[in-house]
């Protein structure tokens, strides 16, 4: 991740100051880039992605079903699947089997990282290596899950957080700037250190036992202009024209 970060910084720095505008997905990213490249914040347009989650998909989960955690991500090392797996393994060791399940959107065959994850934690009964999900299946799992876990170390915008938040259910998120901004306005959220599995494990145990008192609402921070919530507004800023219609950013 460190080498990738250095390469990314070098790539971005080439001709970056020659642009009239730069488009970013999040306000925290505007702050970082402005500081990193010594550019005015007014050169950055914040254009947050919009969710297309279907409100017609409802949960068919029975009341006495096992408590379900869900983590949706691609099998990349910065997604930090190992932290979620470690926490789940420790929780199963403490509570026993059939007390909860953690569903992952990888099956352990996608790449070397996924293979390593399955080798390390494929034997843990409470961890379900489901594999890739199409859009419909993903949204169905959002509806079925009791709680979203999102431990990713690096994101510009955590889209699964946006999508899951529409269900107004608990979320356990990495204590990082992207997660705070993406979850803004959500009412049942707790943040954990993305390097401490035992902290996540304790939160998972607490929520399984029906205690959500440690969770709270994430405050909404006003995003300064220039900011675009749809394509038309974005194009209007870029061309110095007035918006004429709405078109969601995806």
Role assignments for model-derived ranges:
Residues 2-22:
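Membrane-proximal helix-turn-helix segments that form the acceptor-binding/catalytic region
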Residues 16-42:
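A short, active-site helix/loop in glycosyltransferases that binds the activated sugar's phosphate group
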Residues 62-79, 85-88, 103:
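Conserved donor-binding/catalytic core segment of Leloir-type glycosyltransferases
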Residues 100-115, 131-132:
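Glycosyltransferase donor-sugar binding loop
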Residues 114-136:
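Nucleotide-activated donor-binding/catalytic signature segment of Leloir-type glycosyltransferases, i.e.
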Residues 140-145:
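Short alpha-helical donor nucleotide-sugar binding micro-motif in glycosyltransferases
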Residues 153:
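Aromatic "clamp/platform" in nucleotide-sugar-dependent glycosyltransferases that forms part
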Residues 189-198, 206-210:
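Conserved acidic donor-binding segment of nucleotide-sugar-dependent glycosyltransferases
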